[in-house]
UniProtKB/Swiss-Prot annotation:
Gene3D superfamilies cross-referenced by the UniProt entry: 1.20.58.1970
Family: Belongs to the SEC10 family.
Record keywords, A-Z: Coiled coil, Cytoplasm, Exocytosis, Secreted, Transport
Protein name as it appears in the record: Exocyst complex component SEC10b
BP GO annotations: acceptance of pollen; exocytosis; Golgi to plasma membrane transport
Task of the protein: Component of the exocyst complex involved in the docking of exocytic vesicles with fusion sites on the plasma membrane during regulated or polarized secretion. Involved in polarized cell growth and organ morphogenesis. During cytokinesis, involved in cell plate initiation, cell plate maturation and formation of new primary cell wall.
Gene Ontology CC annotations of this record: cytosol; exocyst; extracellular exosome; membrane; plasma membrane; plasmodesma
Top-level taxonomy: Eukaryota, Viridiplantae, Streptophyta, Embryophyta, Tracheophyta
Signal peptide region: none
Quaternary structure annotation from Swiss-Prot or TrEMBL: The exocyst complex is composed of SEC3, SEC5, SEC6, SEC8, SEC10, EXO70A1 and EXO84B. Interacts with EXO84B. Binds to EXO70E2.
Localization (cell): Cytoplasm, Cytosol; Secreted, Extracellular exosome
Tissues showing expression: Expressed in seedlings, roots, leaves and flowers.
Originating species: Arabidopsis thaliana (Mouse-ear cress)
Segments forming a coiled coil: 244-266
Length: 829
């Protein structure tokens, strides 16, 4: 477009010398207004630019530019030239007017062409629509023609299909008729003379056509048996005439089938000896027509070496039980069974490969094989290792007892279960191998709970007999090692042993493990677990109760020993000395029996804690799935342990009696009348406790050390509270035997401080309060007679005890204290 505009508009300085001619073609393609405008004005503007450049080169800066600032001249006073500043403007205006005129003309031309094109397009569109309408009518007609053609084709096809069905039915009938004729001919041959199989067709004697002969024989036999059945039914209804049937054919066919089956089995055995799998498969396929091949499958399984070889059976026994005459252990039996069952699994896996290649229904054969393995080979070895013992006369513990049988049963059951899983993985058809395995142990599992309880009872009895034997042996040898040392050893053997209780729990835990193994149903498991745990409760209850009773017997013997040496007042000095020596021995026996009983109580608590922990960790989770089972076991546990609690309570009462008896003896023997009524009253008093107090506190500290260790919680608090109350009463009774002067009162206060300091270790507030009141009452021996009335103004509850103590004052009569106090405390007079 640029070239065309330049060609039509030659450059000229004259305004009217530019003939502009614009063409429509100039606006086609990539039109640019800037290019059009440039081509229009480039012929005029360059002359002006050239002149401006020439003027600048000749005179330097243009005066009009350099000197003009804000519309005024600067540096010159001469006026500007009168020549026009932009002379081409008139040419440009003329050029633009001509261009606009030509553009208007071009627009009119374009509008005319567009109107013409619209008319042409409208005409062509009408023709096109008319053509499309005609084409649609033609297509509709074509579709109708196709529909008629499709209907005719469908009709012809249905007719052809009917004809084909008729032809196929006719061919099948022809084939059936042909086969029926052949079958009738064969049936007549078999219906000849009874037992005569010599005149049969060659088909029945040709070894190459055995499969065909077997198929035909089965068809003939089925038909003949059905015919005989129909004749029997008609005769029973009275509608048939007697005549000859197909009895001979049935008998001959049975003989032929038996002979053919035996012949095939012989061929199958011969091929099996050669490991000719193709011949075996052919024979098995033919034999499958006889009783679905059951005889062939059973025959194959029965002829396996592991079922008929006696050496295999003997090898199994040696592998599991070891050498003849040796006592097998459960661990050795477990290893032997694992090895044996692995061998059985490998053998079955090899047989499975052969069975899959030979038999048309391998799953049925595998079911027969696995069943035979479990019922013959596995049962044979289980019968050898699981001889059920009698509960009336069980085997002795020295020979393993009932526990050996139970352990063997658990090992055999676990290994057989593993074998069942392995055989299931190898393949056993539709056989429920797990149920069959369970049936092998059904007789043992039915009586298992009774055997388990009897075993626990046998173990407990054996342990107790062992303990009694050791104690008896120590007693018999006590003369050799010394009487006291032997008695000490015997007593330690008779003490409660936490180790024994732990062993009882271990027995029970092992029994629970077996119970979980044998009991699959939650209800059965809960019932068996409860029964077995009850055995443990009975054992622990009896054991710790008997241990506590033995410890109580020692306390009773010590008490009897004390009573034996209680003497009257009028005895000789020699007898009194002997009695005192014997009393010291009785006190030592009492202290020893006290400590022994505390040890028994401590071990009893530890044993109960072990049982309770075992119940929480192992038993409760097995009982929770069954409603009421957990609560019932908790109640049984409480009932069983209540006997031990009763024995412990009685023994603790005896311990308190023992301690009080010795405290009374020490006070009676060590307390002197001068301790609280010294003749040198007024001299500096002795601030030390009395010897009796020192001995009593030392004894209590020594003997109660074991109580502090053995008892805990509420039991400890109750025991020490009772002991403190008894001690307070005993001291009150004891001090009422003496007369007190002021220095003796101070000595009594010193004793009381010792007692108060000791009983504070009990941690019993009620006891502390009683001893504090004793300290207040003891002040009656120290204050002056006139101060007695005001001594108990804040504690009126102890006035009665205080009055009894006041009567023990040395100056009670001389100071006429009875009269003074009766006037002040009339309620006490």
């Amino acid at each position: 477009m640029t070239e065309r505009i330049r060609a039509r508009g030659p450059r000229s300085s004259s305004v009217n010398s530019v003939p502009l001619i614009l063409d429509i073609e100039d606006f086609k393609g990539d039109f640019s207004f800037d290019a059009l405008f440039g081509n229009l004005v480039n012929d005029l503007l360059p002359s002006f630019l050239d002149e401006e450049a020439d003027s600048g080169d000749g005179h330097g800066n243009i005066a009009g530019v350099d000197g003009l600032t804000n519309g005024h001249l600067r540096g010159q006073s001469a006026p500007l030239s009168s020549a026009p500043f932009f002379p081409e403007v008139d040419g440009l205006l003329s050029l633009f007017k001509d261009a606009c005129k030509e553009l208007v003309d071009l627009r009119k031309q374009v509008d005319g062409r567009l109107n013409t094109l619209k008319k042409e397009v409208s005409t062509q569109d009408s023709k096109h629509r008319k053509t499309l309408t005609e084409i649609e009518k033609g297509v509709d007609g074509l579709f109708e023609s196709f529909a008629r053609l499709d209907g005719r084709i469908s009709s012809v096809g249905q007719t052809a299909a009917k004809i084909g069905d008729h032809l196929q039915s006719a061919d099948a009938q022809r084939e059936t008729a042909s086969q029926t004729i052949d079958l009738i001919k064969y049936l007549m041959e078999f219906n000849g003379s009874p037992g005569d199989l010599m005149e049969l067709s060659a088909l029945f004697s040709d070894d190459s056509r055995v499969a065909e002969a077997a198929s035909i024989a089965q068809k003939l036999r089925s038909f003949a048996e059905e015919d005989i059945g129909r004749q029997g039914a008609s005769t029973a209804a009275g509608n048939a005439t007697p005549g000859r049937g197909l009895e001979v054919a049935v008998a001959n066919l049975q003989d032929y089938c038996n002979e053919l089956e035996n012949r095939l089995l012989s061929r199958f055995d011969a091929a099996s000896q050669r490991r000719d799998l193709s011949t075996m498969s052919e024979c098995a396929k033919i034999l499958s027509q006889f009783n679905r091949g059951t005889s062939a499958m059973q025959h194959y399984v029965a002829t396996r070496p592991m079922f008929i070889d006696v050496e295999v059976m003997n090898s199994d026994i040696r592998l599991v039980l070891g050498d003849h005459g040796s006592q097998p252990s459960p661990s050795n039996v477990a290893r032997g069974l694992s090895a044996l069952f692995k061998e059985i699994t490998d053998t079955v896996r090899k047989e499975a490969a052969t069975i899959t290649a030979v038999f048309p229904t391998p799953n049925e054969v595998m079911a027969i094989l696995v069943q035979r393995v479990l019922e013959q080979r596995v049962t044979g070895i289980l019968d050898k290792i699981l001889a059920k013992p009698s509960l009336m006369s069980p085997p002795p513990v020295q020979e393993g007892g009932l526990l050996l049988y139970l352990r063997m049963l658990a090992v055999a059951y676990e290994r057989t279960q593993e074998l069942a899983k392995d055989l299931r993985a190898v393949g056993c058809g539709d056989l429920d191998v797990e149920d069959l395995t369970e049936s092998l142990f059904s007789s043992h599992k039915d009586e298992y709970p009774e055997h388990e309880r009897a075993s626990l009872k046998q173990l407990y009895q054996a342990k107790m007999e062992e303990l009694r034997a050791e104690s008896q042996q120590v007693s018999e040898s006590s003369g050799t090692i010394g009487r006291s040392k032997g008695a000490s050893i015997s007593s330690s053997l008779q003490q409660i042993s936490v180790t024994f209780v732990t062993e009882f729990v271990r027995w029970n835990e092992e029994a629970i493990t077996r119970c979980t193994l044998f009991s699959s149903q939650p209800a059965t498991l809960a019932a068996n677990v409860k029964a077995i745990f009850t055995c443990l409760l009975d054992q622990v209850s009896v054991y710790i109760t008997e241990g506590l009773e033995r410890a109580r017997d020692s306390l009773s013997e010590a008490a009897a020993l004390r009573e034996r040496f209680v003497l009257g007042t009028s005895v000789s000095r020699r007898v009194a000395a002997a009695a005192a020596s014997a009393a010291e021995a009785a006190a030592a026996a009492g202290e020893s029996s006290f400590k022994s009983f505390m040890v028994a109580v401590q071990r009893c608590g530890s044993s109960v804690a072990i049982v309770q922990q075992y119940f929480a960790n192992s038993i409760s989770r097995l009982l929770l799935p069954v409603d009421g089972a957990h609560a019932a076991s908790c109640e049984e546990m409480s009932t069983a342990l209540s006997k031990a609690e009763a024995a412990a309570y009685k023994g603790l009462q005896q311990c308190i009696e023992t301690v009080m008896a010795e405290v009374d003896r020490l006070l009676s023997s060590e307390q002197k009348s001068t301790d609280y009524r010294s003749p040198d009253d007024g001299i500096a008093s002795d601030h030390r406790p009395t010897n009796a107090c020192i001995r009593v506190v030392a004894y209590l500290s020594r003997v109660l050390e074991s109580a502090f260790t053995a008892l805990e919680g509420l039991n400890k608090q109750a025991f020490l509270t009772e002991l403190g109350n008894r001690l307070e009463k005993l001291l009150l009774t004891h001090w009422q035997k003496f007369t007190f002067n002021p220095s003796g009162g101070l000595r009594l206060k010193r004793d009381l401080n010792e007692y108060v300091g000791f009983v504070k270790s009990f941690g019993a507030p009620s006891v502390d309060e009683k001893f504090e009141l004793l300290g207040i009452i003891a002040n009656v021996f120290i204050v002056a007679p006139d101060s007695l009335p005001t001594l108990f103004e804040g504690s009126p509850s102890i006035r009665k005890d205080a009055q009894r103590f006041i009567q023990l004052r040395e100056d009670y009569k001389s100071a006429k204290l009875a009269t003074k106090l009766s006037s002040l405390w009339p309620s006490l007079s």
